[in-house]
Regions:
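Short, compositionally biased P/S/T/A/G/V-rich stretches that sit at domain boundaries
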Residues: 24-45
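Short acidic/polar inter-strand loop motif in beta-rich domains
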Residues: 81-83, 120-128
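Short, solvent-exposed, Trp/other aromatic-anchored flexible loops in extracytoplasmic proteins
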Residues: 88-121
């Protein structure tokens, strides 16, 4: 019986470092992520350049683990909150900019769209506390 307990304890301790790393890295409380352009309410014809702003943290490539640094993710028409214990998804609504980009050319279909920026750590997890922009609404003509 003691042998089984030791195996269970060893397995639990082995998994502990992975559980701890499954959450985002710490972020300064004064970090600010924002849109340089477009602004909330902007009406745009066709494709546009989306420009990202960040204060009190740095921008780096995905996979590079520097203190107080991360890379941008753009959420398009996303209403569900992100799970802080899972990497930010990568799909047509969750755009990754893992090369350290601070701007991107975006093509969206005509209509109203919401945009929000999220800063991800080296492994694409949101920081703790999350570093997110205000959600803005734009209209594409």
């Amino acid at each position: 019986m003691k042998f089984v307990r030791r195996i269970v304890l060893a397995a639990a301790l082995t998994c502990l470092p992975f559980a701890a790393s499954a959450q985002g890295k710490p972020a300064p409380k004064d970090a600010l992520l924002y849109f340089v352009w477009p602004q909330n309410g902007t009406v745009i014809k066709g494709g546009f350049w989306c420009r990202f702003g960040l204060r009190n943290m740095g921008v780096t490539h995905a996979g590079d683990s520097y203190p107080n640094s991360g890379h941008h993710h753009l959420l398009v028409d996303v209403n569900e909150p992100l799970n802080p214990n899972e990497p930010i998804p990568q799909d047509k609504s969750h755009l990754h900019f893992g090369a350290g980009q601070t701007e991107a050319r975006i093509e969206l279909p005509p209509g109203k769209h919401t945009l929000q920026l999220v800063l991800g750590d080296a492994d694409h997890f949101p920081f703790n506390p999350p570093v997110v922009s205000q959600k803005i609404t734009i209209t594409v003509k």
